[in-house]
């Protein structure tokens, strides 16, 4: 498979995830943010750490979180040791949405070639 074919298959994969994600009410970018939050567990994650995890600026993360907060998928968590620190975590409905989209992504992964799976997995390391 040449580079152009790989790129087109990757783009089709992401477009498919994006379309299905929109059915659930979250874009692929929002899914990536939710994934980073989910990986931190119930303690949540500081916005600055979330920005590092998803390669956005802190203000970019703040803008991306706004619709997720408005829809009730993400909630602000208080920091026990320092009131100035703000963390965000997934709400129960956000965790359920994340699970639904994750299963959908896994289903899509099973439909792409093994070569594309290896490429996708290498991009997440």
Residue ranges and their predicted role:
Residues 1-24, 71-73:
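N-terminal leader segment of winged-helix/HTH proteins
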Residues 8, 32-35, 99:
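A cross-family signal for key residues in well-ordered alpha-helices
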Residues 15-57:
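N-terminal helix-turn-helix DNA-binding core of bacterial DNA-binding proteins
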Residues 47, 65-66:
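Short, hydrophobic-biased segments on the C-terminal half of alpha helices
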Residues 66-124:
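Charged, amphipathic alpha-helical coiled-coil/dimerization segments
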């Amino acid at each position: 498979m040449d580079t152009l074919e790989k790129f087109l298959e990757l783009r089709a994969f992401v477009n498919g995830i994006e379309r299905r994600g929109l059915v659930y009410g979250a874009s692929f970018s929002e899914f990536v943010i939710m994934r980073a939050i989910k990986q931190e567990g119930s303690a949540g994650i500081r916005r600055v750490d979330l920005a590092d995890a998803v390669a956005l600026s802190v203000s970019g993360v703040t803008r991306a979180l706004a619709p997720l907060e408005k829809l009730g998928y993400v909630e602000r968590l208080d920091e026990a040791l320092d009131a100035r620190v703000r963390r965000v975590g997934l709400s129960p409905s956000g965790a359920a949405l994340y699970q639904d989209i994750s299963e959908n992504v896994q289903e899509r992964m099973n439909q792409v070639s093994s070569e594309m799976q290896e490429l996708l997995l290498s991009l997440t390391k």
